[in-house]
Amino acid sequence: MKVDLTGLRREFTQSGLNRTDLDNSPFGQFNLWFEQAQKADIIEPSAMSLATSDNNEIGIRTVLLKYFDMYGFVFFTNYNSKKSKELQSNPNVALLFPWLVLERQVKISGYVEKISMLESLKYFSSRPKASQLGSWASQQSSSLSSRKVLLSQFELMKVKFSNGKVPLPDFWGGYRVVPLKIEFWQGRENRLHDRFIYQLNKGKWRIERLAP
């Protein structure tokens, strides 16, 4: 079966991106674009694709950015999951934010490092109790015979932690993606898109325009 999609074509109509528009810091530029994405009609602007590799196998999935600062971009997961095992084997990763409503995307390349337990605890404590229980109930990436098994485990956790606070699992926490390259892409007419990349060189960020 062949499905022909060559007729699916639309022109990009948003305004362009010039060198003079850019913040000197990629984090400042990301913050500006992220704020604009939040105001746009985007369902989940913090959703990002996380690409990993391990033993010549490429993995990709969507995770949620929980916060960022001048040190990197933080997400949370189960440390026993398939993605975490890949990260332990090869910490080099890439992120992609596809803000298609704005005809934009941001690509980030770098490496991951675990955040501290205290930092993970601070975020875990802010989550709804049901989400905290879900972290305990799910053995992420393991095989399930049915959804009923997962729901039964969730009910067990509700009983186990019915009194008091839900503790942070020792197998759950955050990773920080430390960026080495951050590219900002803005769609333009005739596919002559604007691309600017920030590259870290001897502790300083260098900005360069790339051909589309």
From Swiss-Prot:
GO molecular function, one term: FMN binding
InterPro entries (alphabetical): Pyridox_Oxase, Pyridox_Oxase_CS, Pyridox_Oxase_N, Pyridoxamine_oxidase_dimer_C, Split_barrel_FMN-bd
Name of this protein: Pyridoxine/pyridoxamine 5'-phosphate oxidase
Pathway: Cofactor metabolism; pyridoxal 5'-phosphate salvage; pyridoxal 5'-phosphate from pyridoxamine 5'-phosphate: step 1/1; Cofactor metabolism; pyridoxal 5'-phosphate salvage; pyridoxal 5'-phosphate from pyridoxine 5'-phosphate: step 1/1
Cofactor(s) required, per the database record: FMN
HAMAP family: PdxH
Family: Belongs to the pyridoxamine 5'-phosphate oxidase family.
PANTHER family attached to this UniProt entry: PYRIDOXINE-5'-PHOSPHATE OXIDASE, PYRIDOXINE-5-PHOSPHATE OXIDASE
GO biological process: pyridoxine biosynthetic process
Cofactor detail note: Binds 1 FMN per subunit.
Disulfide pairings: none
Catalyzed reactions per annotation: pyridoxamine 5'-phosphate + O2 + H2O = pyridoxal 5'-phosphate + H2O2 + NH4(+); pyridoxine 5'-phosphate + O2 = pyridoxal 5'-phosphate + H2O2
Function comment: Catalyzes the oxidation of either pyridoxine 5'-phosphate (PNP) or pyridoxamine 5'-phosphate (PMP) into pyridoxal 5'-phosphate (PLP).
Enzyme Commission designation: 1.4.3.5
Binding site for substrate: K66, Y123, R127, S131, R191, L192, H193
Species whose genome carries this gene: Vesicomyosocius okutanii subsp. Calyptogena okutanii (strain HA)
Presence of the UniProt keyword Oxidoreductase in the record: yes
Domain of life: Bacteria
Keywords from the UniProt entry: Flavoprotein, FMN, Oxidoreductase, Pyridoxine biosynthesis
Residues annotated to bind FMN: 61-66, 76-77, 82-83, 105, 140-141, 185, 195
The keyword Lyase appears for this protein: no
Subunit structure: Homodimer.
